[in-house]
């Protein structure tokens, strides 16, 4: 389990782009993570997406999954951004959206390590609300030294 203070040690993102509120399960040996993002009407993106029918933008759901995957990657390497390592989100495959995410939802973020080759990491990810899958796909990250 990781609270927001520890999450901030592993992710360089800050408001309004830090999209992981808590890690509830982290299994480095099993190479998987489960975290969540509480989706509030106060999120800045709801002002324009869409004012009369607020929906969390799909690209931000993908980014939230990528941030959870990044935490897993850092933990697997036993490094932090302060150590001079960063993960860049470089792509996605097989991404599918199944239902909208709205204010008041708790977005569960799950990532499982698939492979790493020449500093390119691939994770299988999904996002859920009320145990229903809202998004799934593969996240691709590049590990770089700063």
UniProtKB/Swiss-Prot annotation:
Pfam families: FabA
Stored NCBIfam families: fabZ, PRK00006.1
Function summary: Involved in unsaturated fatty acids biosynthesis. Catalyzes the dehydration of short chain beta-hydroxyacyl-ACPs and long chain saturated and unsaturated beta-hydroxyacyl-ACPs.
Protein name in UniProt: 3-hydroxyacyl-[acyl-carrier-protein] dehydratase FabZ
Domain of life: Bacteria
Reaction equations catalysed: a (3R)-hydroxyacyl-[ACP] = a (2E)-enoyl-[ACP] + H2O
Gene Ontology molecular function: (3R)-hydroxyacyl-[acyl-carrier-protein] dehydratase activity
HAMAP family documented for this protein: FabZ
EC numbers: 4.2.1.59
GO CC terms: cytoplasm; membrane
SUPFAM superfamilies: Thioesterase/thiol ester dehydrase-isomerase
